[in-house]
Amino acid sequence: MQIGNIRLSAPVALAPMAGITDMPFRIICKELGCGLVVSEMVSAKGLLYKNVKTFDMLRIAQEERPAAIQLFGSNPMELARAAKIVEADGADIIDFNMGCPVPKIVNNGEGSALMKNPQLAYEILARMADSVKIPVTVKIRAGWDEKNINAPKIALLAEKAGVAAIAVHGRTREQYYNGKADWNVIKKVKETVKIPVFGNGDILTAADGLRMLKETGCDGLMIGRGADGNPWIFTEIINALNGSCGKYEVPLDVRLHMIERHLQMLKDFKGEVIAVKEMRRHAGAYLKGMPMAAEYRRRINELNTCEEFGALLREYRNEAEKFLAAKHNFCSEAD
């Protein structure tokens, strides 16, 4: 799959997620087969005001390329200037956010609010595309609400503006992340434009991904919440695309090793205090569905140092292995 002049190793992308898709997590997903990773959304105004924390979000490691930086805002001139900054900083692709449903973003006329203003969206995308040489992409929703499903119209305008690819989340802004994604909207977008289309929404397994490709005809898959705590979904999907249909069951030890590694990467990237704070949430996602997960998620939220994290993980490993061994013995006796 190709976006402009950027060749992807696989037609599977990591969706931008605030508080999740920072550099460490993007590297992990890339190592597990993801073809394109996208940053957390970055404020165009923050870049223009030279905010240090905002500029930190532009950092890209060589091993995660190709990588896209996602911008948000609503002022065409500001976004064009911000796009130039992102390009100069070394991004491979610039993505534009038209999907965020959060009130503080929408109330500023940004994110999914732009689904209600097609002409402004077109002007923004045209100015961004004209201002840089690297590909510009956009992520949209099905529409504002069920009475205003306009993703195909927005997609056509985006293509006209010079956008190189488009990702479509099959939910409206009104839905947030509730209910079901309407994959038929993704199909209509694919039928409307010639540029590559990523389908997004309700892809939690490889089977979901294969079904979306078949039902919508989309060119690629964009995985968001399905990768949260489960970056192995990229390996599973790529294996499925290559003909292996079995679900990849991630062993407990592999999950715990990933938590340890992710914590170390966060520490190296952001320092121990922030790393531990952010890893509480990540660890909870990694442990979802594991034995005694609820109890240990609660205890993880009380941790303050990497040393405490390591000690609790060692305790959990021992207790979980005992639990699984006892369960195995019980099942053997029952047979």
Task: Place the predicted regions along the sequence by residue.
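N-terminal small/glycine-rich loop or linker at the start of catalytic domains
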Residues: 1-13, 45-68, 100, 104-108, ...
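Glycine-rich, positively charged N-terminal anion/phosphate-binding segment
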Residues: 2, 17-92
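Alpha/beta catalytic cores of nucleotide-metabolism and tRNA/nucleoside-modifying enzymes
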Residues: 8, 12, 18, 23-24, ...
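Hydrophobic faces of well-ordered beta-strands that scaffold small-molecule active sites
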Residues: 12-16, 37-39, 67-71, 94, ...
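Alpha/beta enzyme core
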Residues: 31, 80-110, 118-195
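Active-site beta-loop-alpha junctions enriched in small/polar residues
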Residues: 17-19, 42-44, 72-74, 99-101, ...
